[in-house]
């Protein structure tokens, strides 16, 4: 058996974006996930995988069955899946964790094969306008969760 050592990074897929072929976009992304090699150790989803994701306590957006099935198959193979919130999918609460993903809300430094990487979506890096900071803080309030 070959040793697992591959790590993949994906961001800004924007599933659900109104494009000419949204179902095709979802299918291509699910196919990409399904074709990750057996040596894959980790997958980092670095935000904005969905163009708009708003999750309630007991309700999640409909659709994306192919993508969730592909992610579940990866996790069943032992691939660790990390999900960073982006500015389009900031309204995630516990669903991804229930599926087995590790949810990250802030940039972090990770070590991969002896090298350190700073990972995150990036929307909060650099100068951030007050209005954006205010909205992000507002959406994080338990009352709005």
Named regions from a protein language model:
Residues 2-6, 10, 15-112:
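Core catalytic region of metal-dependent phosphoesterases/phosphodiesterases
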Residues 9, 116-120, 126-127:
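Short hydrophobic-aromatic micro-motifs
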Residues 109, 116-117, 136:
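A residue-level structural signature of the nucleotidyltransferase/glycosyltransferase Rossmann-like core
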Residues 122-145:
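Active-site-proximal loop/helix segment associated with metal-binding centers of metalloenzymes
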